[in-house]
Curated annotation (Swiss-Prot):
Enzyme class at the top of the EC tree: hydrolase
Taxonomic source organism: Shewanella sp. (strain ANA-3)
Gene of this entry: aguA
Keywords: Hydrolase
GO BP: putrescine biosynthetic process
Protein name listed in UniProt: Putative agmatine deiminase
Domain of life: Bacteria
Reactions accelerated catalytically: agmatine + H2O = N-carbamoylputrescine + NH4(+)
Amino acid sequence: MTNANVDATQLTTKPSEDGFYMPAEWAAQQAVWMIWPYRPDNWRSAGAYAQATFAKVADAIGGATPVYMGVPQAFLAEAQTVMPSHVTLVEIDSNDCWARDTGPTVVVNAEGECRGVDWGFNAWGGHNGGLYFPWDKDEQVAAQMLKQHGFARYSAPLILEGGSIHVDGEGTCMTTAECLLNANRNPDLTKEQIEALLRDYLNVKQFIWLEEGVYMDETDGHIDNMCCFARPGEVILHWTDDETDPQYPRSKAALDVLQNTVDAQGRKLKIHLLPQPGPLYCTEEESKGVTEGTGVPRTAGERLAGSYVNFLITNDRIVFPLLDPATDDIAAQKLQEIFPEHKIVGVPAREILLGGGNIHCITQQIPSGK
């Protein structure tokens, strides 16, 4: 166990000026970060079910990549008993456990040096549709993770969650208008200004804008639940063939965009379709275990934004969510076809979905820089 309650060195330049860029998720990784789930108004039984699931995710990742977990001081003893022994527990305070969105975006240069981008955070919408209040501890998470690795820090003047962007490492950034252009994120910035900041801090050249993400995704349609890069020139899209399903027009509109765009290198995209599980709904029993608080209520009968696209690429592994016995095997087979060199590891992940996200949302990779 280590303590990371000290800020990282802050830089006054921008990554693009210094020759740094965000690498793709398939680049070599030295670590993956997670955060302990405990929030009783989001996780049933004060996180007990989620904690057991997070332990399984950490174990699956740990076979390929070292895992760090940020844990508030009050929960360290409990985390030591629940988490696999290979997980490095680091004392970090947080309001909730979405490492993808509160953790840093680590950028690298040609020499393999790593630095971190610390984005602004307002709990997915602040006082205009955000998911809880306060979020002051979450705002400090990225700097503490960077301190643990000794990486210098860029502070970006943009409210942005890691789950709202995907890059191919070759100049292309994919995102959704539903999230990045939402009035509850950066209301004073135009699309062009947001693109300019992403060019500065990710060092990308080309943008692929999908209009919307997954139906009922409370993050306002994060790209990481909807579509991701598999490798340069290839994407994986969340899909349903059911034209009566509310997801269909969203996925169809995304497919139309993807079929008619090119990436930063001028390539047309190869598009893989990953089937939608379910539809899945929160049960009465599942909603009962969540207490009332400042978080969004978890209601029985509510449709869950389940998606197999919400997986993590970590070195030679793909860690993906098992969500529906009717489609889990199909998703695993499809992922193995897309990633023939990777080990495909499924983890039962309904408990993460009940809290509003999935495996990609609760993890944040630290590239090796190699």
